[in-house]
Amino acid sequence: MLFRSGFDHVPNSSEEWQYTVDENLACAVNGSIFMDNSGFFTNIRQRLQVQPEDIRLRKLAAELEKMAQSGQYNYPRAMKRTDPAAAFFALSAFMESSMKAAHILSQKYAPYSKWLFRSTEALPKFDELAIAVRNIAEGKNITENIEIACAAVRAELKAQQISNSDDYMSVCADDAKHRADIIYTAEEIIAMEWDFFDKVQNEGGRADCQDDYYTFSIMRRSQYYCWELPMLCSL
């Protein structure tokens, strides 16, 4: 399982998570566990289930960029110059990136391509996207279905307060990257504050809250996640 993650341990930093491959992580966290009396295997799987939010957003931004480049830009240009091969490659890239974006927004790891469409059909919020992808694959109203797929992704971006844009997917990608930068910076500040807080010596002894990082981090996130980068960087 750890080999599937690309490490001999569970990634424990944003930098390590950045180099994990979602298809491998999908293999690691799916499937039935028939026996794990020690709980070791289950514990590792649970820790691999959710990646840091800034990494999720950066991976999402990458797929949104691909959607814009392949579906909203390359495909119509290829059709305009009567280049069916280039159009085919653009559509293939668009379908893959839109389905991967749907998985990321659903907090799921996208599986390998042979299972990607079936997995997308099972995502609760992306019925319209799955239908649009099928229609594109069958050559039906391609331009219209590209925009239907984009609209489905944009709707969930708005629901998760990642982007409110109705523009090209590249604009949504920029919004996702900006949000990732805010979260990464906030998490660095929270970690530094906790380190200082942990070392405080009180006259009456160590306070209970000094051993409760979970509550401490939630309180700080509720504050810092609402700030813009310039304000965070001024701390």
Protein language model regions, located:
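Conserved NTP/Mg2+-binding pocket subregion across the NTase superfamily
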Residues: 1-80
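Acidic catalytic cores of enzymes that act on phosphate-bearing nucleotides/polynucleotides
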Residues: 72, 99-107
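Solenoid-repeat scaffolds in large eukaryotic assemblies
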Residues: 86-88, 232
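Small-residue-rich helix-loop
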Residues: 95, 109, 113-127, 149-159
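Charge-rich, acidic-biased intrinsically disordered regions
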Residues: 112-130, 166-180, 212
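Long, low-complexity C-terminal extensions of enzymes
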Residues: 135-181
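Short amphipathic alpha-helical interaction elements located at domain edges
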Residues: 181-235
